[in-house]
Amino acid sequence: MTKLMNRDEFRAALENAIKGKSANKAPFSVAWATGRLSRAHLARWAENHYHYVGPFADYLGYLYARTPAHMVEAKDFLLANMYEEEIGGDRHTDLLIRFAEACGTTKERVIDPDNMSPTTRGLQAWCYSVAMREDPVVAVAGLVVGLESQVPSSYRKQTPTV
């Protein structure tokens, strides 16, 4: 039987698995980082990103409810992440709305679920599905390591051009 990895080994293996697949290398991210996007592009991005980021605490809440009670550290991690998403400092959705408005769109367009693109709707559905159906370890790997952990490095590359 294969030996289970400890937490640090598992995290390193996950990070190695996504190397070379970073959101930083996506054409949109590259265009943003090099200053080739218009305010209209950024407004549309914010209108869509809101619908992925907005329910992130909900995804984590579903996952928290399904995480076995004996996984206390994992449950604490999920609670801390939910707190940070919703209460700890500026709410991410509020920041997105302000950014979107600065780019020329309205709060009404940002929060309107009928305004999100089919791709964003698919990403949101995938996030809910993973949170509700996958093993908690798989769900954390996909949602937190695979998606959420890429956002800060993307923003570091994009912020100077804004």
Positions of PLM-derived features:
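Active-site-proximal alpha-helical scaffolds that flank and shape metal-associated catalytic sites
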Residues: 2, 7-11, 73-162
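Acidic, low-complexity proline/glycine-rich segments
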Residues: 2-29
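Alpha-helical bundle segments that constitute or directly flank the non-heme di-iron/ferroxidase center
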Residues: 17-23, 32, 36-69, 84-91, ...
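Intrinsically disordered, low-complexity regions
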Residues: 1-2, 34
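A short small-residue
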Residues: 28-33, 127-129
